[in-house]
Design a protein with these regions (language model features):
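The beta1-alpha1 cofactor-binding region of Rossmann-like NAD(H)/NADP(H)-dependent oxidoreductases
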Residues: 5-6, 26-37, 70
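Substrate-binding pocket helix/loop in short-chain dehydrogenase/reductase
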Residues: 63-65, 69-74
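Active-site loop immediately N-terminal to the catalytic Tyr-X3-Lys motif
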Residues: 65-66, 114-121
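Active-site helix of classical SDR
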Residues: 88, 125
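Alpha-helical segment proximal to the catalytic Tyr-Lys
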Residues: 93, 138-139
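Residue(s) in the substrate-gating loop at a strand-loop-helix junction
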Residues: 109
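SDR active-site lid
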Residues: 142-197
């Protein structure tokens, strides 16, 4: 699922080329009703839900605090935080329904572990994702649902590209999203092997 149709079609084609069964649907993660629709379509297509990966994110508020607007903060809260909340709220009951356990994988950021200047809303919302993930890991343990949170550093995404032009120091630090990094490899292995994070 993605709000960007071009990215959605690219991901669908890549997965289908690997022989993976695919359901591709447009999703604005900040809309709980859209999450419910996606969940219903996924259950119809696959029979049950085992995992949800919350990977949406927006930068929104780049700049000094005195120039930041409420709208930028609200956008970051809606996408980066509430998108994760809605994803779990809608999918967890469906994972619990089959009684086999499952996974919630939330993608936060190293920015959520410590402040990156001029990115207050991004830092704050990603820190909230880390805290939620830790809370949910305890809350859902008895149901056999594992919760992992990934905190990548700079990855070459649209957020990175918009910041790169403004912040020279980022240029040599970004991960290439087409190459498997150590954190994504570890996450993939945990899920494949059923190892707790």
């Amino acid at each position: 699922a993605d709000i960007d149709d071009k990215n959605l079609q690219k991901a669908r084609a890549e997965l289908e080329s690997l022989g993976v069964p695919v359901l591709s649907v447009s999703l604005d993660v900040a809309d709980e009703l859209q999450w419910q629709s996606v969940a219903q379509q996924a259950v119809v297509r696959f029979g049950k839900i085992h995992m949800v990966v919350n990977n949406a994110g927006v930068g929104a508020d780049s700049g000094p605090i005195e120039s930041q607007e409420k709208e930028g903060w609200q956008w970051a809260l809606d996408v980066n935080l509430m998108g994760v909340v809605y994803g779990a709220k809608v999918m967890v009951p469906l994972i619990k329904d089959h009684g086999e356990g499952g996974w919630i994988v939330n993608v936060a950021s190293m920015a959520g572990m410590g402040g990156v200047p001029y990115s207050g809303a991004y830092n704050a919302t990603k820190a909230a994702v880390v805290a939620l993930s830790e809370a949910w890991a305890e809350e859902l343990k008895a149901a056999g649902i594992h919760v992992a949170v990934l905190c990548p550093a700079f990855v070459q995404t649209r957020i990175y590209d918009s910041e790169r032009n403004r912040r020279e120091q980022y240029k040599s630090k970004a991960l290439n999203p087409d190459e498997e990094s150590s954190f994504s490899k570890k996450a993939r292995e945990m899920v494949q092997n059923g190892i707790e994070p």
